[in-house]
Amino acid sequence: MICLLRTARLSARLLFASAAAPCRRASRFNVPPSAEFVARPVGVCSMLRLPVQTSAEGLDAAFVGVPLDTGTSNRPGARFGPQQIRAESVMVRRYNASTGAAPFDSLLVADVGDVNVNLYNLPDSCRRIRESYQKIVASGCVPLTLGGDHSITYPILQAVAEKHGPVGLVHVDAHTDTSDMALGEKIYHGTPFRRCVDEGLLDCSRVVQIGIRGSSYAPNPYKYCWDQGFRVVPAEECWMKSLVPLMGEVRQQMGDGPVYISFDIDGLDPAYAPGTGTPEIAGLTPMQALEIIRGCKGLNIVGCDLVEVAPIYDVSGNTALLGANLLFEMLCVLPGVKTM
């Protein structure tokens, strides 16, 4: 299911047995090593420099890479997203100083490597992703996914809904991703949520899409979403304002049911996140992204993803750094995370 090199496992054991011990403070959880004791360039390139393991068994939450961009319609490169997000995550520390969240004092978390996708066959990749996530979800672990293009969310939600039933969705994106097909193909990064509706994977009364914008092929690009009962919040409704009030409404709408967070990095303005395949001008800010994710605290979150980071268009590394921090923020709002 998960591809990991034997040498990576050995290096991880050596690193975390010898170098990370000083920052564990007798914790029974995995803890990112402090740069006070372990230099940031040292060790295996894992998410947050956490231990690497081949299975999600025994974990409360796991970072999972899905290095696939076969479903892209514009600029490729998201297959390298997981690798670069992991590399930039060395800057993320143990505690969330802004919210007080202490995920590594609360949950057992590790990096379980990458799904062995088939870059030559998108339907087969979807099967591989679905089967991998069925095992992860069945173990009781909450997956936090490093994408990859947005087509990966469809098979992930197949696995998640198999266990939890139809889920609510907090979807941040420049696009609704509800197209039906392109060039005769029904699976690509513009169709995941259409396919999810077709298969009953979403509780459509609890779907919110935030940051949608850009030109359209149709005169009413939101008609399909509205017809399903989705709430669409265009980017224009977010300009120059805090999204804290909006997220209060979202929490009420989501209620106690299972919720999945899907965050396409192109939901943010390309001034902040240029390293993506289908950028659209006039998007959200990083501060609004934090308000959205932190506003999900208290929800019954059963999975998250951060998709569409394409490092080849990210010269400074800022897009991947932003992605790494947003994934950390998602970890911080999972059920069971204590505050200091």
Curated annotation (Swiss-Prot):
GO terms for molecular function: agmatinase activity; metal ion binding. Its cofactor is Mn(2+). Its main location: mitochondrion. This is Agmatinase, mitochondrial. Pfam families: Arginase. InterPro entries: Agmatinase-rel, Ureohydrolase, Ureohydrolase_dom_sf, Ureohydrolase_Mn_BS. Belongs to the arginase family. Agmatinase subfamily. The keyword tRNA-binding does not apply. The lineage of its organism: Eukaryota, Metazoa, Chordata, Craniata, Vertebrata. Pathway: Amine and polyamine biosynthesis; putrescine biosynthesis via agmatine pathway; putrescine from agmatine: step 1/1. Mn(2+) 1 binds at H150, D173, D177, D264. Signal peptide: none annotated. Keywords: Hydrolase, Manganese, Metal-binding, Mitochondrion, Putrescine biosynthesis, Spermidine biosynthesis, Transit peptide. One of its GO terms (biological process) is putrescine biosynthetic process from arginine, via agmatine. It catalyses: agmatine + H2O = urea + putrescine. SUPFAM superfamilies: Arginase/deacetylase. It is an enzyme of class 3 (hydrolase). NCBIfam families: agmatinase (TIGR01230). Mn(2+) 2 binds at D173, H175, D264, D266. It is found in: Mitochondrion. GO terms for cellular component: mitochondrion.
